[in-house]
Curated annotation (Swiss-Prot):
Gene for this chain: Cartpt
Principal cellular location given in the protein's record: secreted
Signal sequence, renumbered to the chain: 1-27
Tissue: Neuroendocrine tissues. Predominantly expressed in the hypothalamus, pituitary, and longitudinal muscle-myenteric plexus. Abundant expression is also seen in the midbrain/thalamus and eye. A lower level expression is seen in the other brain regions and adrenal.
Record's protein name: Cocaine- and amphetamine-regulated transcript protein
Length: 129
């Protein structure tokens, strides 16, 4: 008798867990049907309650010069040809012996170029030795 109760208890628990989402979904549908949000999202576009933001001056004295300078830089960057070895990810250009091959930023070291055969990038001097 008690062994049948012990077997029945997990089965009833599993059935209850399966039915809980179904019961909760019906309560959510009822909550979604309430008309409390209808006044916020009305179908009629009424812009009288909206404030108009103040317009900033577009023609500030230094702004025109800055825009022109940025446009010149963009033109130069667009016309600049990127070598094939820089386009390929994971490859860096070759540098000469004694040339700076890395940059240190805090505890990190960034590789600028590959050292030629027979030399390696010294992590203290950051040069090909």
């Amino acid at each position: 008798m008690e062994s049948s109760r012990l077997r029945l208890l997990p089965v009833l628990g599993a059935a209850l867990l399966l039915l809980l989402p179904l019961l909760g979904a019906g309560a959510q549908e009822d909550a979604e049907l309430q008309p409390r949000a209808l006044d916020i999202y009305s179908a009629v576009d009424d812009a009288s309650h909206e404030k108009e933001l103040p317009r900033r001056q577009l023609r500030a004295p230094g702004a025109v010069l800055q825009i022109e300078a940025l446009q010149e830089v963009l033109k130069k960057l667009k016309s600049k040809r990127i070598p094939i070895y820089e386009k390929k990810y994971g490859q860096v250009p070759m540098c000469d012996a004694g040339e700076q091959c890395a940059v240190r930023k805090g505890a990190r070291i960034g590789k600028l170029c590959d050292c030629p055969r027979g030399t390696s990038c010294n992590s203290f001097l950051l040069k090909c030795l």
